[in-house]
Structure formats: structure tokens, C-alpha cells
């Protein structure tokens, strides 16, 4: 029903088709041409421009599920620049090619996340900026709808990562600044430090070396704000294995560690020149060991809780030599003292003194 020209449907009119589709608008030579509205029984509605029976130019499509597209069409498909609003709240505004989201655009998710940048086949791909509903921001490369390549993630809590990504995860080389001000530079895997890297803490302390699954593990060097340094093996962020600890006052320990404590065989050199070689347990001299003091005193034998305890040989600065039992650093029990003069006392000792002599000699 409508206008005719020279026997052809041309001008304004209304057409109702056998399949239930209706069209109201402009015609030329019996084809939709110009501006018109097509309504399908299923709820699909197109309002806009037509050329020779094909949707072409500016138009608005309302889909049966409530989604709405407003923008350019070419050869009946979304092509050019347009905005799609989904019933669930998703909104895309940007470029389209052959009916697909393709090119530069802005994508707003129902939860409030917003992406602005390049898209391919409806997915984030190329350079873009994602602003999340909680305020976090990612700026960088995407591939197949995930962060991939190089990019910067800035969290509202102060966490900032700059570096490489793979399939949505922090992976490769990068730098992260933590909310407490600590800075890590190195390699990552599965979103955490993994491989080799250096962390610098706000107080100036540092660790440089191996990492595993976000934890200090392997070989590395730790420096502390009090001047202390440790170089050696770590396990679960504790000194464990072989390592050297150097204090600012000159004390140096080289040897075995376990769970952050000196444990096993080691060598301790003290600031005054004293040297101990032997066993340690829980950070204390314990077991068998040898100590040499700057004044010439030496002791070889048993230790417990950091002090001489057990059986051993003590050589004093004056040349006297005691061989026997010690308790808490004092001669205690059976022992023999060989004096520098050549005299010898054999017997029982208590609190460092001979209390019962069983033999003597020259």
C-alpha cells in the first residue's frame, strides 16, 4: 500500500510479506530504498537507511533479546562505526567490519569494567586500556582477549607492575612496586617472582638472586640496613645450605645453615681476631670444634650452647695445657694439666680448680 510511479512501487508505502515481515518507508522500483522500518514477527526491528533493498548507511537494529545496535551498516551487516547495547548492560561503541567488532572501540562490561583500544573479532587485541570497576588500570598489549605482550598494571592499593605478560598472566621480565614501597626487578612466572631478580625494601635492605613461585629460593645475596650481608643458599626465604654472613663489626661466618640458623660445620671469625672452626647448632657452637684467640689460647673439643663443654684440650697463652673434662667453660671432672714448667697435675677438677690430685709428675 503506497505510492507508484510508471507502474513501479516507488515512493512512500507499507509492505506486508507472507512470512510476517512488514516494512514501512521509502521504495524505489519495488525495493526498500531510502529511509524505512522493517519489523519481523520474532521481534527484530530495523529502522534506518536502505539502498536497493539492502540495509546500508545509518540505522538502528533492535534484536529479539533486547540488544540494540545504532550505527553504520554495509551490505546489510554492521560495518563502520556503531554502538551495540546488550540487554545485560554490556555496551560496545566503535568500529565494525562485516558484522564483527573490529578496530578501535570502547567496551563496557555489565560489572563496570571498561576497555578502550583495539579489538579483533570481538576480542581485545592490540594496544588498549582496561579500567576495572574497582579502580585498577591496565595499559598495554592484548591478545585473544587477554593481557599479552608488554603492559602496565596499576592497582588502587599502590601495586604497580611494568613489564611482560603472557595469556593474561605476569610472565617474563618486569618490575613491580608493592604497596609497602618495596621494588622487585627481574623475571616472573604465573604472576609471581620466579627465576632471578632483585628486591629493594623501603629501609634499603636488598636481596638479589634466585626466586621460586614468589619466594626467595636458591642462591643469592642479601644486604641489610644495619650493614650485615649474607651470600649463599636460601630455602623458603631463610638461610639454608652453604653461606657466608658478614657483620658490620667484622664478624664473619662461613659454613652451613638450616632454617635461618647456623647449623652444621662452619668457620666463625670474630672482630677481635678470634677464630672458631667446628660444629654449630641453632646458631650456637655445639658439638666438636676448635677455637683460637688472639692472645694464643686454643681449645679443641666439645661445645654446648655456645660454650666449652665436654672433653677437650685447652692450650693457654702461657704454655700450660689442660686435657680433660669441661663444664660451662670451666675445668670440671677428670683432667690433666701440663704446665709450661714441665710439671703435671692429674686429678679431679671443680669450677676450674684441682680439688683431688691422683697423680703428678715433672
Show where each model-derived region lies.
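Conserved anchor residues at repeat-unit boundaries in beta-strand-based tandem repeats, strongest
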Residues: 1-10, 22-33, 46-56, 68-79, ...
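Short beta-strand elements of solenoid repeat domains
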Residues: 1, 14-17, 24, 37-40, ...
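Short, low-complexity, Pro/Ser/Thr/Gly-rich segments in the mature regions of secreted, periplasmic
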Residues: 353-362
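Intrinsic disorder/low-complexity segments
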Residues: 16-19, 31, 68, 88, ...
Amino acid at each position: 500500500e503506497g505510492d507508484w510511479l510508471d507502474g513501479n512501487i516507488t515512493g512512500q508505502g507499507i509492505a506486508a510479506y507472507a512470512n510476517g515481515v512488514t516494512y514501512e518507508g521509502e521504495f524505489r522500483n519495488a525495493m526498500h530504498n531510502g529511509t524505512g522500518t522493517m519489523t519481523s514477527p520474532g521481534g527484530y526491528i530495523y529502522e534506518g537507511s536502505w539502498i536497493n533493498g539492502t540495509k546500508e548507511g545509518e540505522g538502528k537494529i533492535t534484536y529479539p533479546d533486547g540488544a540494540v545496535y545504532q550505527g553504520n551498516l554495509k551490505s546489510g551487516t554492521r560495518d563502520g562505526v556503531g554502538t551495540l547495547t546488550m540487554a545485560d548492560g554490556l555496551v560496545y561503541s566503535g568500529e565494525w567490519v562485516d558484522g564483527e567488532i573490529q578496530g578501535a572501540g570502547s567496551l563496557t562490561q555489565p560489572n563496570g569494567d571498561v576497555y578502550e583500544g583495539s579489538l579483533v573479532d570481538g576480542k581485545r587485541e592490540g594496544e588498549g586500556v582496561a579500567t576495572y570497576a574497582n579502580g585498577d588500570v591496565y595499559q598495554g598489549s592484548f591478545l585473544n582477549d587477554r593481557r599479552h605482550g608488554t603492559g602496565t598494571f596499576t592497582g588502587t592499593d599502590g601495586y604497580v607492575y611494568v613489564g611482560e605478560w603472557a595469556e593474561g598472566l605476569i610472565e617474563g621480565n618486569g618490575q613491580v612496586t608493592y604497596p609497602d614501597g618495596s621494588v622487585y626487578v627481574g623475571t616472573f612466572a604465573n604472576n609471581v617472582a620466579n627465576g632471578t631478580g632483585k628486591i629493594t625494601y623501603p629501609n634499603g635492605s636488598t636481596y638479589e638472586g634466585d626466586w621460586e613461585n614468589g619466594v626467595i629460593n636458591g642462591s643469592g645475596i642479601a644486604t641489610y640496613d644495619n650493614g650485615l650481608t649474607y651470600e649463599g643458599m636460601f630455602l623458603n626465604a631463610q638461610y639454608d645450605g652453604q653461606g657466608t654472613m658478614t657483620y658490620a663489626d667484622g664478624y664473619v661466618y662461613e659454613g652451613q645453615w638450616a632454617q635461618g640458623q647456623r647449623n652444621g660445620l662452619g668457620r666463625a671469625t670474630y672482630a677481635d681476631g678470634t677464630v672458631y672452626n667446628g660444629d654449630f647448632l641453632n646458631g650456637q657452637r655445639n658439638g666438636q670444634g676448635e677455637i683460637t684467640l688472639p692472645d694464643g689460647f686454643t681449645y679443641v673439643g666439645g661445645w654446648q650452647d655456645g660454650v666449652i663443654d665436654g672433653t677437650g684440650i685447652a692450650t693457654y697463652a702461657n704454655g700450660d695445657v689442660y686435657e680433660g673434662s669441661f663444664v660451662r667453660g670451666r675445668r670440671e671432672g677428670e683432667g690433666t694439666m701440663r704446665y709450661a714448667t714441665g710439671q703435671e697435675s692429674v686429678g679431679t677438677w671443680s669450677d676450674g680448680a684441682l680439688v683431688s690430685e691422683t697423680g703428678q709428675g715433672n
